[in-house]
């Protein structure tokens, strides 16, 4: 018997085996543990890059969107309310929150640090970006540059 996550991965693999030009995935990481989510998103990115495929990812997980998407289309009550590059969409955090979405947690951290005057750099949308932006800043503050 396959677990829910295994069934999801098998279904996605079956669709990918057909080598579609456009791959539409609806909440592909729902129910997956963090490692399974990371592996699946990496495979989706690799497939997209290697096969020059358009991937439409439907998700409530802004962390997933930040990690794999170049653009985001945000809908509310069946209407398109935003369609832009990830950085521009996530820069509208208050609007996203009003419709029940949020920016990635790491982006909220950057915003809060900026509000408190502790950070002046760019917002990060992934943990990897945050590490690249914040670690040098923190080292300078501690005098360990």
Language-model regions, residue ranges each:
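H-loop/switch region of ABC-family ATPase nucleotide-binding domains
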Residues: 59-60
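Conserved catalytic motifs of ABC-family nucleotide-binding domains
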Residues: 19
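Catalytic Walker B motif of ABC-type/P-loop ATPase nucleotide-binding domains
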Residues: 23-26
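A short, surface-exposed alpha-helical micro-motif characterized by mixed small hydrophobic
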Residues: 65-67
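Conserved ABC ATPase signature
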Residues: 1-2
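ABC ATPase "signature
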Residues: 83-84
